[in-house]
Design a protein with these regions (language model features):
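Catalytic machinery of carbohydrate-active enzymes
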Residues: 1-234
Length: 234
């Protein structure tokens, strides 16, 4: 019997259970390494209801929240700029995170309460309904969260915004947005050990003006270039 996962004790990898440093490779590489198989990126086979979304007209799904603050896109006007642009181009924007829109604390992490979106946030929506909304969307835009992985698995064109992890960490089949500022601090997930109890975790620059600069320095124009490419907007 094989035990498959990321095994570590404190800040030390348990070498007799996992033969390599999983932080230096794509997350998907862990199972084949432990099982002695050739690594290749594989999407899971998902069974999705044939039911159609109840959203009329063409739309884009966004999922700006995540389980760690370090995963957020921290540009203060980033998400609203993307929403306004998509609305201007005739696309509805659907927000699908569990974290509720209109909650002051959660909204503060996004630069304020986002406007111009169809609100499908909340923890009372079934995963099957999330999958339908993602499947029928023209595009998904998210951060390093489970919903981005779900979109990729479903096959919806996906934009993933992250500076917390290096681009090789997640999956190749997406538009991966990473800061163009070569001086910015990046990739703490791959270099350090996350403290899940510290919401403001930023191991190199917490409580300084450089706090979360890995995504503060990702400009909306970078994301819009990927949006235009995937939606064929010229």
């Amino acid at each position: 019997m094989f035990n498959v996962g990321w095994f570590y004790d404190g800040e030390e990898i348990v070498k007799d259970k996992i033969p390599f440093n999983f932080k230096k490779h794509p997350l998907q590489r862990t199972p084949p390494e432990i099982l002695g198989l050739e690594y290749k990126e594989v999407k899971p086979k998902l069974v999705i209801s044939r039911k159609k979304t109840n959203i009329r007209d063409k739309y884009v799904v966004i999922a700006p929240h995540a389980s760690s603050h370090a995963k957020y896109w921290m540009h203060p006007k980033g998400w609203q700029t993307i929403i306004d642009y998509l609305n201007e181009k005739g696309y509805k924007v659907v927000m699908i995170t569990g974290e509720p829109l209109g909650d002051e604390w959660h909204d503060s992490k996004l630069g304020g309460t986002l406007t111009g979106v169809i609100n499908k946030t909340g923890y009372n929506i079934d995963l099957s309904d999330r999958m339908i909304d993602i499947r029928d969307a023209e595009l998904f835009i998210g951060v390093g969260s489970g919903l981005s992985w779900l979109s990729w698995s479903i096959g919806t064109p996906t934009i993933l915004i992250s500076g917390f992890s290096y681009p090789y960490t997640e999956f190749k089949d997406c538009e991966r947005i990473f800061t163009l500022d070569y001086k910015a601090c990046t990739g703490c997930f791959n270099r350090k050990w996350l403290d899940p109890g510290d919401w403001e975790w930023c191991p190199d620059h917490k409580d300084t003006p450089r706090h979360f600069e890995c995504t503060k320095t990702i400009k909306p124009d970078q994301v819009l270039l990927a949006v235009n490419k995937l939606l064929n907007i010229y």
